[in-house]
Amino acid sequence: MSKKVLITGGTSGIGREFVDVFAKNGFEVWFTYFSENEKPAEVTASYPKASVTGFKLDLADYASIESLASALPSTPDVLIHNAGLGSKTVEKVTNTPQGQAEALIKVNAIGTLWLNNLLMPKMLERGSGKIILLSSVGGGVTQFPGFNYADGMSKAAIAFLGRTLGADLAQTGVDVFTICPGATNTPMFQASTLNHLNAEEQKKVIASLPKFRLIDPREIAELGYFLTTDAGKLLHGAVLDASMGLGVNPGLLLK
């Protein structure tokens, strides 16, 4: 019987790569999307020989989270908390600073906690499971001048949750990992950091990064898949700096 993975935010960026990696490794994949504008049917149609199903989810709405938990055919073997808002994408939700701060905290941190609180007990009851949290190098590992406060706070909260769950579940069959990506070539990063720059300015930003390039979202997805293997158990509870060195040298962006 195929293992099941639930991936929140599976229609673009890192989440879309998670869908692809797990589908191609024989998992039954359940992914979430916020609206039909994300074209979830196209994601599903990409895998005619695999079981890939989309579920609508609003992480800011507890009723929506409860509805998702009830709609799942069973408890996932792997739960990947990937969905979230960024400092620019949050502008699609609300245009006030207060509303944006609230949305960032509620979607990125509180919604993730709500969903985890509904599904983790079932994993513990079963005696096995993998939980992967997506934070960010900004907030989860270090800080950058000018970084959106609420965005950074939400990512710091996810890193805290990962460490605490790692401690609480250390002697259970459920493993927990937190990944903190650096500058990754996703629509969210492009919107927050690159799209307002001209071509030369974009090249300058990328040239200032470790390894002189953006991280490919596939690299983060492959790391996540590794964590679900037996070899990944060694990293239970770890908050992984997956930034190619930006987390230990954040000043690179200021040069």
Question: Where is each model-derived feature located?
Answer:
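Alpha-helical segment proximal to the catalytic Tyr-Lys
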Residues: 121, 167-168, 233
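Short C-terminal tail/terminal secondary-structure segment
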Residues: 236-255
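Catalytic loop of short-chain dehydrogenase/reductase
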Residues: 85-86, 130-157, 162-171, 183
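Conserved glycine-rich cofactor-binding loop
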Residues: 11-12
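Short, small/polar-rich loop/turn modules that mediate ligand/substrate recognition or access, typified
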Residues: 170, 175, 235-237
